[in-house]
């Protein structure tokens, strides 16, 4: 019902929804998700997907453990994984005739007014062309000091910049917490 009243919808996908702990890509889940996106587009909705998964898919390709990566290596792995991520989306969404684009953002891109306005213009033009932007943090150049750290925050900022009516966060976390419950056991 709420989606019926929304014109622009931002959907954030956590990497665990795309690839499981055993590094197996969840193709069936992504295929079902693409059907939902197609339905939204058929109903004249503008959709932005904020997707995690570049580092996880890079680790899969290189057979690495994500937890052992230092920043410089994780930046390289993200660069490798970003192509894998976009290929995964392209293969899945092409069968539904959904046009995709890619936007990689840093914290500065969303916090500096001129850059945020440019991002807004890009989103608006992609909507006019009936493309679905897939947004991710530009992990290959982001450093600890200028990094979002998780795509929930990035998705929130993308929703603000794009003027979205609705933000949907899809993850394997049960509910909304004050902190990451996997790291902070006192999270509420």
Q: Predicted regions: what is each one?
A:
Residues 1-188:
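Nucleotide/pyrophosphate-binding catalytic subdomain
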């Amino acid at each position: 019902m709420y989606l019926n009243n929304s014109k622009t919808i931002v959907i954030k996908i956590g990497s665990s929804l795309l690839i499981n702990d055993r590094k197996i890509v969840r193709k069936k889940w992504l295929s079902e998700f693409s059907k939902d996106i197609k339905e939204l587009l058929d109903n004249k909705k503008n959709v932005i997907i904020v997707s995690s998964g570049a580092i996880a898919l890079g680790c899969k390709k290189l057979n690495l453990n994500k937890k052992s990566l230092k920043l410089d290596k994780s930046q390289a792995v993200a660069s490798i994984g970003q192509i894998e991520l976009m290929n995964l989306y392209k293969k899945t969404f092409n069968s539904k005739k959904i046009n995709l684009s890619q936007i990689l953002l840093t914290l500065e891109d969303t916090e500096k007014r001129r850059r945020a306005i440019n991002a807004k213009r890009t989103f608006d033009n992609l909507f006019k062309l009936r493309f679905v932007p897939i947004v991710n943090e530009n992990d290959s150049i982001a450093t600890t000091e200028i990094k979002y750290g998780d795509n929930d925050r990035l998705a929130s900022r993308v929703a603000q910049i794009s003027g979205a009516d609705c933000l949907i966060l899809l993850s394997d976390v049960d509910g909304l917490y004050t902190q990451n419950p996997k790291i902070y056991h006192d999270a509420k």
